[in-house]
């Protein structure tokens, strides 16, 4: 059974800083209001989403095994390979040649790759299986459509 897949690896490349405005108020979901009077600052999404540019890459998500963690089909994962893949982190793993995104469980010598959707079972990593952790997911970018 294919649990979940990630596709299209893309390296983050250093480029021009793109500062986006951040407004100092919470947006009401009702009547629109003029916003420019409330401009607080500008942010660069590179700074907000990427701590280690030379060890960060982006993956596109397919499948629904991680929807409970806010990782939706069609979303993009920001992955940092310099972060230690510890218990509880969401990781990009290759198990027996298959790429997946799951929450890492490491306790008392047991390693599991845990989905965040009750439709799927945990992947218990057996000693004879090959497991490689590519990196830790640091951010998720999901479409709203």
Q: What positions do the PLM features span?
A:
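Structural motif
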Residues: 74-75, 89
């Amino acid at each position: 059974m294919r649990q979940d897949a990630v596709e299209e690896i893309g390296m983050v490349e250093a480029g021009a800083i793109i500062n986006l405005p951040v407004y100092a108020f919470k947006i009401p979901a009702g009547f629109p209001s003029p916003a420019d009077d409330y401009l607080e600052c500008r942010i660069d999404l590179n700074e907000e989403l990427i701590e280690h540019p030379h060890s960060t890459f982006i993956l596109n998500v397919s499948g629904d095994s991680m929807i409970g963690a806010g990782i939706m089909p069609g979303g993009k994962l920001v992955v940092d390979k310099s972060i230690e893949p510890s218990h509880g982190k969401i990781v990009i793993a290759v198990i027996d040649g298959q790429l997946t995104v799951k929450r890492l469980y490491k306790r008392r010598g047991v390693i599991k790759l845990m989905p965040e959707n009750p439709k799927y079972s945990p992947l218990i990593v057996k000693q004879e299986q090959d497991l490689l952790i590519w990196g830790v997911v640091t951010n998720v970018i999901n479409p709203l459509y």
